[in-house]
Amino acid sequence: MLSIDSPANPKDYELHDEPQPNTAEEFKILLKLVGPVMITTLLEFFPGFVAVTLAGNIDSPYAQHYIDAATFSIMLINLSSFSVGFGLASALDTLCSQAYGAKRFEKIGVYFQTGIVVLGAILLPVFAINWFTEDILLWLGQDAEVARLSGLFSRYMLPGIPFLYLYELTRKVLQAQNIMTPLVIIAAIGNTVNIAAGYVLAYHTSIGFHGIAIGCSLGNSVLPLLLVPYFISRPHHLRQWWCQPWSFKAAIRYVGVFLRLGVPGMLMLVMEMWAFEALTILSGLLPHHVVAVAAHSVLVNVNLLVYTAFDGLSVAANIRIGNCLGAGLAKTAKPACVVVLLMTFILALTFTAALYGFSGQIPRLFLDTGDGADLASKVLAIWSPLTIVDGLNAVTQGVLRGAGKQKAAAITNGLAYYIFGVPLGALLAFQYDLGVEGLWLGMGFGSALNFGAMAALMLCYWSWEKLAIEAKDLTEL
C-alpha cells in the first residue's frame, strides 16, 4: 500500500509550503501503481476476450455466426450497461482519490454508499435494454440468425451485472487508497471461473454456445463475493473508510455531487465506447459483411487488449493526480502528469512495433485461415501506428478524472468522435471503398484530435494551484 504525504490537518495546508517535487520519485511511485492496476485491468478485460475466442473455436459450421453473435451481444452490453455503470462510477475516481489525499477517510465510505444508490437505480433500464437485444439488432439491419443468438447470449449475461457493479464501486474505493494486490488476485480467480465454466458448458454440455455467456455471468458474480473473505482477513482495510453504518440519508446527500462528476464521466466513456461500437454496426453493413464483422471483431479485441495497458496507466494517473490535488500538492501533480504521459508514449511505441511486426500472426489466434483473418491482418498493420495517439488519449483522460474535469473531456470526446472520427470513418469505408480499413483510420484520427484538444486545454488553461484549491473545497462539502 503506497502512501501520500499530506498535511496532518488538510483544512490548514498552504500550497506554497509544498516541497519541490522529485521527478525520479514520481516515476517510482507511478511504476508501483501501474503494475498492479495494469494487471487488474487486463484480467477484467478477459471475459469479452474469452467469449469471442471460445465462440470462434466451437467445432460447428455456424462458428462464424457464433463469433458475430458474441461480438454484437458484448457490444450492446458494453453500450448499455458497462459504459453507463462504469462511467457513473468514475465519480469515485475523483471523489475517493482526492478524499484519500486530504485524509478525509470517512468521506470515502459515504461516497461508496452514494455509488450503490446511483448504480442500483439504473439496473432496471439496463436489464430492459439488454432483454431485447434481438429486436434491437434486427432494427439495426443485422442478420436474423446472428440477432437471435445474440439475444439469448445477452439474457444469460444479465445476472452477473449487479455483482459487477458492486465490485466496480469497491475496486475504485480500494484503488483510491492505493490498495492493489487483492484486486489482482480476485480478478484472476474471477477469470478462472469464467474460463472454466464457459469452456465446460460450451464444449462439454448440450448448452453449447450460450454456455459461454453463463460462464461470464458466473465469473462476474464471484468478484464481489471474493471481497468478503478479504475484508475478514484484513478488517483494517474496511474500517479505514467504512467509518459509519449504512445511512440512506447520508448517501442521498451526495447524489448531486456524484452525478455532477459521474454523468460527464459516463459521457466520457460512452462517447468513446459508443463510437468504437458504431464501427461494429457499420462493419455489418459493408459488402461481404460476415467477413467484415469477423475482421473487425479481431481488431476490437486486439485493440481492447492493448487498451487495457493504457487504461492501467490512466487509472494510475487518476489515482496519483487525485491524491496529490487532495493533499494540496499542486507542484507534485504537474510532474506526475508529465511522467505518466512519457511512460505512455514509450509503452505505445512498443505496442506499435509489436502489432505491426506480428500483424500477420495475431488474427489467427482468433480466426482460422481465410478471408476474415487476411483482412484483419491488413487492417492491423494500418492501425498499429495510431496506437500511440490512442494510448496518449486514454491516459490524458485519466489525468482529467483525477482533477475532476470530466465535463471538459466529455465535450472533447463528443466533438472528436462524432463530428470527426465516425463520419470520416464512414466516408472512407463506403464512399472511398476502404471498408474496415477506412472505419479504423477514421477513428484513429478522431483519437488524435481528442488528445490534441485535451493537451491544449491542460497547457493553456490549467492552473495546478487552482485545481488543488478546488479539490480541497470538494472534500469539505
State the predicted function of each range.
Residues 49-53, 128, 135, 169-173, ...:
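Alpha-helical transmembrane segments of multipass membrane proteins
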Residues 52, 67-127, 131, 167-176, ...:
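Small-residue-rich hydrophobic transmembrane alpha-helices
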Residues 32-52, 167, 190, 219-223, ...:
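Transmembrane helical elements of multi-pass membrane transporters/channels
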